[in-house]
A protein has these predicted regions:
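Short intracellular "coupling" helices and adjacent cytoplasmic loop segments at the cytosolic face
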Residues: 5-15, 111, 119-143, 147-151, ...
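Juxtamembrane helix-loop junctions of ABC transporter transmembrane domains
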Residues: 13-21, 45, 52-68, 91-138, ...
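An intracellular "coupling" helix at the cytosolic face of ABC transporter transmembrane type-1 domains
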Residues: 36, 130-131, 147-156, 160, ...
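Helix-loop-helix
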Residues: 71, 176-190, 260, 264-336, ...
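ABC-type nucleotide-binding domain
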Residues: 74, 358-636
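Transmembrane helix-loop-helix hairpins at lipid-water interfaces of multipass membrane proteins
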Residues: 37-98, 178-183, 285, 292-301
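Hydrophobic alpha-helical transmembrane segments of ABC transporter permease domains
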Residues: 25, 44, 98, 146-191, ...
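Membrane-integrated ABC transporters
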Residues: 1-53, 68-87, 102-106, 110, ...
C-alpha cells in the first residue's frame, strides 16, 4: 500500500491545569453515570470514618482533663472511664466497618468503570477507519488498553477516594481544631501554607515527567509489537543487533522519564512528613508555652494533647493528598491517551443504498426477502417521493477519472479510468508503489477518493452503505490473518450464520477439505497464534474458504500466491479459480503467470495506468508488460 510510515507515538505536551480538570471531570462523569449511588455510599462511609477518627482524638481531652485528673482527685472512678469509652468503642467499630465497606465499594466501582471504558474503547476502535490503524503503532494502541486503563483503575479505586477522604477529614478536623483552640488553629494554617507550597512545586516538577513516561511506555510497547510481528524478517536480515540497539534507545528514554518523574515524586513524601513533624513540634512548643503562661486557662493539658493529636490528623491527610497527586497526574496522562482514542472521528458513512436478499419474479420484478436466496439486490430509497427501487447486484465496477492521495499534499493515483464488466477478471501489475493495492482499497472504501467517481453497478459507491459494500466484496490476502478458534470458526468468519455444512462445502470448493481432515481434530482443530501450526499455503486455502462461504458477487485477490511453493500454488490457484467463477474479480499477483487468463490486465506505473489489454495484446505491444513477462521480473 502506498502511504506514509506508521508512527510509534506523537510527543505528548505537558497538560495544563485546565486540561487536567477537563479530563478529570469527564472521567468522573462516567463514574457518576454508572455508579452514582455507590459513590454516594462511599462518601457517607468516608464521613463516618473521619468522624470516628475525630471522636478518638477529641476524647483524649476529656481523658486527661476529666477522667485521669478526676481519678487522681477521687471525683471519678475507673467505672466512669469505662462507661465513657463504651460509646467511643462503638463509634470506632462503626468507623472500621465503614472503612471496609468503602474499600469493597471502590473495588466494585473501579473494576466496573474499567469494564465500561474498555468496552467503549473497543467498540469505538471497531468504528475507526483503516487510516487510523495505518498511521498508529498497534503496540501503542495496546498500551492504551493495558497500561493507561490500569492507571485509571488505580485513580478511581484508590487515588480519588483517598483525596476525597483526606479532604473531608481535613475539613472536619479543622472545625474540631477550631473548637479546641482558634489561636493554635491559625498557627497550624500558617505552617500548613509552607507545606502546601513545597508540595505544589514538587508536583509540578514531577507531573511533566509522568506524562512523558506514559508516552514513552506506549512507544516501547509499539516497538516490541513490531518486532514480534516481524521476527522472521529480523532474523532473515540479521537485524537482531540493530533491533536491540533501537530498543535500548527507546527503553532508555522510558527509564529517563520514569526516573525523573519518580525522583521528584519520591521527594514529596519525606518532605511532607518532615514538615508535618516540624509543624507538630512548633505547635507543641507554642501550646505548652500558652498552657504554662495562662495556667491552663486558654490551653489545658488535655486540650493540648487533643489538639496535637488533631494536628497530626490535620497534616497527615494533606500529606496524603500531595502523595496522591503523582498518581493522579500519571493517571490523567493515561486518561488523556484513552480519551484521545475515544475522540478519534469514527469512519464516516453517508451511504443509504442497502444490499438485501432478493428474489426475481418471472416478469423480472425484483422483490426483497428475508430468506437467503443466492440473489442479491441494491435497495435504493428515493427521498423525493418515498419510493424504493431494487437493482440486481451484478458486480460491475467503474473508475471514472479517479485521483487519490493518502495525504492532500501527495497524489498517488492519477486519472484512473477503467471498467470491469460483471464476471470479468481484472489484473493489476506493476512495480512497488505503483498503486495496485491502493486501487483495491478504494473499491471497498477503506479510503475515499479526492476526485472522480467510482460506480458499482452504476451506483456511486459513496451512496452505498460501507457495511453493505464490503459485504458484497470478498477478499483473499497474501498475509492471511486467522483468529484464535477452531478451523470451522475461522471459515465461518466470512458469514457468521453459515451452517457447518456450508463451511465444509466452502472448504471443498477452496481445495482445503483434504488437509483439514488430516488435522488432529479435523474441522474442530483449535488454531492459535494466527494459525502458526499451519503452512502459508494452508492458511491461504482457509482464507479462500472464508471468502467462499460469504458467497460474494465480487472478489479482491491481493497478492494471494506470492509466498508459497509451486505445488501449493497449484492447489490455491484451483481453489481461487473455482471461487472466481461467475464473479467480478480484481487480482494482484507477483507472478505474471497467474494473471495470463485475465479478461483485462492493467499495467500501473507511478499511480497511472500505462498499458491495458489481454495478455496476448500486451505481449504484442512489447511494452512494459512484455518486459516484465519475458524478463521474469517480479511485479511487486
Amino acid at each position: 500500500m502506498m502511504g506514509g510510515p506508521r508512527r510509534r507515538g506523537a510527543p505528548m505536551p505537558r497538560m495544563s491545569i485546565k486540561r487536567q480538570g477537563h479530563i478529570l471531570k469527564r472521567l468522573m462523569k462516567i463514574v457518576f453515570e454508572n455508579y452514582l449511588w455507590q459513590f454516594i455510599a462511599v462518601i457517607v462511609c468516608i464521613v463516618v470514618t473521619a468522624y470516628a477518627t475525630i471522636q478518638s482524638s477529641t476524647f483524649t481531652r476529656d481523658l486527661v482533663d476529666v477522667y485521669i485528673a478526676g481519678i487522681q482527685k477521687g471525683t471519678k472512678t475507673m467505672g466512669d472511664l469505662a462507661n465513657a469509652m463504651m460509646p467511643l468503642g462503638c463509634v470506632l467499630a462503626l468507623g472500621v466497618a465503614a472503612s471496609y465497606i468503602r474499600q469493597r465499594l471502590m473495588v466494585s466501582v473501579g473494576q466496573g468503570t474499567m469494564l465500561k471504558i474498555r468496552t467503549d474503547l473497543f467498540t469505538h476502535m471497531e468504528s475507526l477507519p483503516i487510516r487510523y490503524f495505518d498511521t498508529h503503532s498497534h503496540g501503542d494502541i495496546m498500551s492504551i488498553y493495558t497500561n493507561d486503563v490500569d492507571t485509571l483503575r488505580q485513580l478511581i479505586s484508590q487515588s480519588i477516594p483517598e483525596v476525597i477522604n483526606s479532604a473531608i477529614s481535613v475539613v472536619m478536623v479543622f472545625f474540631a481544631m477550631l473548637n479546641n483552640s482558634w489561636i493554635m488553629t491559625i498557627l497550624s494554617l500558617i505552617l500548613l501554607t509552607f507545606q502546601m507550597l513545597a508540595s505544589a512545586k514538587l508536583a509540578k516538577l514531577s507531573g511533566k515527567h509522568f506524562v512523558a513516561q506514559q508516552a514513552n511506555l506506549g512507544r516501547v510497547n509499539g516497538f516490541i509489537e513490531e518486532m514480534m510481528t516481524g521476527q522472521k524478517v529480523v532474523k532473515v536480515f540479521c537485524h537482531e543487533e540493530k533491533a536491540i540497539e533501537q530498543f535500548g534507545d527507546l527503553n532508555e528514554q522510558l527509564r529517563t522519564s520514569a526516573h525523573e518523574a519518580n525522583r521528584w515524586a519520591n521527594t514529596l513524601g519525606p518532605i511532607n512528613n518532615n514538615l508535618g513533624h516540624i509543624s507538630y513540634v512548633i505547635c507543641a512548643m507554642v501550646g505548652s508555652a500558652l498552657s504554662i503562661a495562662t495556667g491552663g486557662t486558654l490551653m489545658s493539658t488535655g486540650r493540648l494533647v487533643a489538639f496535637l493529636t488533631l494536628n497530626r490528623s490535620f497534616s497527615q491527610p494533606i500529606s496524603q493528598i500531595t502523595q496522591q497527586l503523582n498518581s493522579i497526574i500519571m493517571a490523567l496522562a493515561g486518561a488523556e491517551r484513552v480519551f484521545n482514542l475515544l475522540d478519534e472521528a469514527p469512519e464516516a458513512d453517508n451511504g443509504y443504498v442497502e444490499l438485501v436478499n432478493a428474489k426475481e419474479a418471472p416478469d423480472g420484478t425484483i422483490t426483497e426477502t428475508t430468506e437467503r436466496t443466492g440473489l442479491w439486490a441494491w435497495k435504493h430509497p428515493h427521498t423525493a417521493d418515498g419510493s424504493v427501487s431494487y437493482r440486481k447486484l451484478s458486480g460491475g465496477v467503474t473508475f471514472d477519472h479517479v485521483d487519490f492521495g493518502y495525504t492532500p499534499e501527495k497524489t498517488v493515483l492519477h486519472d484512473i479510468t477503467m471498467y470491469a464488466m460483471p464476471g470479468q477478471k481484472i489484473a493489476f501489475v506493476g512495480g512497488t508503489g505503483a498503486g495496485k493495492t491502493t486501487i483495491t482499497n478504494l473499491i471497498n472504501r477503506f479510503y475515499d477518493i479526492q476526485d472522480g467517481k467510482i460506480r458499482y453497478d452504476d451506483i456511486n459507491i459513496n451512496k452505498i452503505r460501507k457495511s453493505d459494500l464490503r459485504r458484497s466484496l470478498g477478499m483473499v490476502l497474501q498475509d492471511t490473518h486467522l483468529f484464535t478458534g477452531t478451523v470451522l470458526d475461522n471459515i465461518r468468519y466470512g458469514r457468521l450464520d453459515a451452517t457447518d455444512a456450508a463451511c465444509i462445502e466452502a472448504a471443498k470448493l477452496a481445495n482445503a477439505d483434504e488437509f483439514i481432515r488430516k488435522l488432529p481434530d479435523g474441522y474442530n482443530t483449535m488454531l492459535t497464534g494466527d494459525g502458526a501450526n499451519l503452512s502459508q499455503g494452508q492458511r491461504q486455502l482457509l482464507s479462500i474458504a472464508r471468502a467462499a462461504v460469504a458467497d460474494p458477487p465480487a472478489l479482491i485477490l491481493d497478492e494471494a500466491t506470492s509466498s508459497i511453493d509451486t505445488r501449493t500454488e497449484t492447489l490455491v490457484q484451483r481453489g481461487m479459480d473455482a471461487l472466481m467463477k461467475g464473479r467480478t474479480t480484481f487480482v494482484i499477483a507477483h507472478r505474471l503467470s497467474t494473471v495470463k487468463n485475465s479478461d483485462c490486465i492493467m499495467v500501473l506505473e507511478q499511480g497511472r495506468i500505462i498499458e491495458r489489454g489481454t495478455h496476448d495484446q500486451l505481449i504484442a505491444q512489447k511494452g512494459r508488460y512484455y518486459t516484465l513477462y519475458t524478463g521474469n521480473a517480479i511485479g511487486e
